[in-house]
Amino acid sequence: MNPTTVFRLPLLFVLAYALILSGSLILVSYPDVSVRYPELSLAAYLSKVFAFQLIQLTGLFTLTSLFFYHYRITQLNRKTVLAVIGLTLFLYTANMILGSLKAEWLSHLMAKMIAEKAEFADVILLVKTTDIGLYLISFVLLGIATRLVAKYYLKVSHPAVIPDGKAPDIYALLFSCGMVYLMWMIALFLTAVITPYLPGGIPAPLSDNAYTTAAGLLISCGIIFIVVRQKFPVAGGILQIRPLVISVLLSTVLSILVMAAITAGTVYMVLLTSSFRHFGVTELWMMTAVSIALTLWISRAVTGVMFRR
């Protein structure tokens, strides 16, 4: 019998995507870039590009895990491996086409904005918003392609929302992690919109927040993993999606607000006490630990309240 897997096929998808991307960067992109910037090494170029791609790769793992489990692509065999590789090639091609359209559209629009003497913050906001929009479009395309592959190539039968009863908490975990990822993307978009209206605020490009966003995503998914495994109930074998959706949304929104409050309070205290010269890595780790603890408490409390109703 073919072994059932939940995370091996999504991991294969991400590794295949990273391998294709690396080959394209090394064989196609870097030779062109090195002509213009001879001082840029291959390692520095790859690290810079993968910093930009880190958000998408972490999101790909959680969302492909959800897609594959949802459409019952869980059997590890030759057909599923070929299907995963085909989906990887499809997504890479779609992203390349979207990237080309983005570059052409942005160059035309930015030239127009510069001619109209638009603010630099508006240009950065436009770039950041476009990046987030392309991420979401690529994920929608991946979901549609996964459904078509499961239906017409693998011909799997799938009770879409009701698991087979063996591990319903896995579906809840994947569903929640996918939602948290999308919430992080929405939070980035809102940050980009709000920042220009703050005193001296200029939104940073999306790549500047790559490591922070990926770390926040992993921490949030880890917290949800702990909460879901301990508290996720099944009533009559049917997955309770509605309270799960509400609890994840509330937990994520409240956690983002708490982290924003902690950051604002810390900045205010540092400026008020004139201790910014002594503020370093230790204090940042303390802020992170407090944010994680409060996020864990909020998630447990909200999940408990929603499922007791």
Model-derived regions, located:
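Alpha-helical transmembrane segments and immediately adjacent membrane-interfacial amphipathic helices
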Residues: 5-32, 48-70, 83-109, 127-155, ...
